[in-house]
Amino acid sequence: MNDWTALTVTTTTEAIEAVSNILMEAGAVGIQIKDAADFQKETVDAHGTWFDPKTVPHLASGAQVIGYFDPATSLVEQRDHIATRVRGLAQFGLDPGAATVTLADVRQADWANVWKQYYHPLRVSRFLTIVPKWEHYTPQQAGELQLTLDPGMAFGTGTHPTTQLMLSLLESVIRGGETMIDVGTGSGILAIAAERLGVGDILATDVDEIAVRNAEANIKLNPVSHITVTANDLLKGITLSADLIVANILAEVLVPLIPQVRPRLKAHGHFLLAGIIADKATLIIRTLEDNGFSIAQRREAGGWVALDAVIKETA
């Protein structure tokens, strides 16, 4: 008997995280991402060599998101529904690409090794390098910080522009000792990075119980001890006040989150937002301004926007 059923969605780079979320909601116990954009150059900008893409099999264009399901899951019936949801991403400003959905059986041994073909140490910012848990890595410069992740567990593994934009913003605002709330933590990468950069106590939340367990597992792989992970719907019911609030989620979810942030953000704090496709940036900025925020920083990469918002100063 085969151990897993793999459901593959052919899509675009910009839709990867949204498609990953669709598959997790459908019951996927693991997500694999193949993105041609990760293999377009031999080096990662100014941060040094990553690896030579010619030595690794990869897609020539586009992206694939592969969800791994228990074989008892009735995917034949779900396949059309998943395809419809993926095509529906167009109404949110995301290009779903071909949006084709295929099924295949995969044995446990194959699944356990497949991540190692596509995931290698990746320098993602000035100080941060993401390393898969099976690889030994030696820092290349003083002050470099390693984030150890299991990429077979959830999306948010650092290869997507939204994650890298958020990590660079974190580096720019953290001074040390802050309190932070990470809304929609996913793999826990932002919370882990924040503590490694000097943040004190961190509350990481996600509406998905599977994501909560995945974040907890990734946290155990790193030298961090001040992160609490809990299942929660955005900031509903949370009374903690924080110096930093971060959210790397789709614009459609950021809109209802923004009014919840203002009462929870301390004076002179920072609200960092990512997951914003470029043509949704105006909507998000307007919503922020309507709720008493101003934009301190704006960063862009690969058609995505990240923002650093602060509470407007009163005269």
Swiss-Prot record:
It is an enzyme of class 2 (transferase). The keyword Ligase does not apply. S-adenosyl-L-methionine binds at residues 163, 184, 206, 248. Pfam families: PrmA. It comes from the Bacteria. One of its GO terms (cellular component) is cytoplasm. CDD domains: AdoMet_MTases (cd02440). It catalyses: L-lysyl-[protein] + 3 S-adenosyl-L-methionine = N(6),N(6),N(6)-trimethyl-L-lysyl-[protein] + 3 S-adenosyl-L-homocysteine + 3 H(+). GO terms for biological process: methylation. Its EC number is 2.1.1.-. GO terms for molecular function: protein-lysine N-methyltransferase activity. Keywords: Cytoplasm, Methyltransferase, S-adenosyl-L-methionine, Transferase. SUPFAM superfamilies: S-adenosyl-L-methionine-dependent methyltransferases. It is found in: Cytoplasm. Its main location: cytoplasm. The keyword Amino-acid biosynthesis does not apply. Methylates ribosomal protein L11. Belongs to the methyltransferase superfamily. PrmA family. This is Ribosomal protein L11 methyltransferase. It comes from Lacticaseibacillus casei (strain BL23) (Lactobacillus casei). The gene is prmA.
